[in-house]
Amino acid sequence: MPNFTIPSFFILFLTFLFIWTHNLRKRQEKHEAEKEAFWGKEERSLAVRKKEIPAELYFHPNISRLNFPALDLEPAAAEKYKTLEKQIRSSVSLPMLSLSDMSNTDLRLNFGTANQPVIAQAEENYEAFLNFLYEYAVLMNEHDHADEAITALEEAVRLKSDICQHYFLLADLYQAQSADGSLQILTALVQDMDSSSKQRILNYLAKLS
């Protein structure tokens, strides 16, 4: 009876096929488990009743240090400045939140489905106010009111802005005033940030050091 030898390459192929099939099955099982967990969490979140949003999550802007100085502007620019001042002053009393690090599902689980529109509006208020501060800072800087621009930008930083332009302009103004200590403090604050903008801001600050 002749000897029958299985070619080594065939054994390797079968081994590879077994491992590949095993890993594929594991991935599919993991995917199914994750999908089931996601939809289970989603279903639970939709049933959560409205919960009070903790007061400490809200931002409380302070514009008491802003002077809104008189500027020598053309009529159209003067009207724009007047509108900007009104927007800043009226925004201060609006509720402001920044919960972008939480998914919609997590928001519903923590605060209830009914609070989603409330949260969305408060986040919109927050983002708008930060943009108003930046617009104001740029205008002040363009009209030789650097200290006023710094005050506005420092307030944005205090409110935990993650908008790069706030930090870029503030750092430039600090450097122009040779305020190395303030620049170091700003760098330390950015290092403690938990934001996708963090590294980009740090890279910019490093160039000024």
What are these regions (language model features)?
Residues 2-128:
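N-terminal alpha-helical interaction modules that lie
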Residues 89-92, 123, 157, 190-194:
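A conserved position within tetratricopeptide repeats
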Residues 127, 160-161, 194-195:
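Short coil turns that delineate tetratricopeptide repeat
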Residues 135-136, 169-170:
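Structural register within alpha-helical repeat arrays
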Residues 139-140, 173-174, 209:
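Residue at a conserved register position within TPR or TPR-like alpha-solenoid repeats
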Residues 145, 178-179:
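Residues in the short coil linking paired helices within alpha-helical repeat scaffolds
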Residues 150-154, 180-193:
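Alpha-helical repeat scaffolds
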Residues 165-166, 199-201:
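TPR alpha-solenoid repeat register
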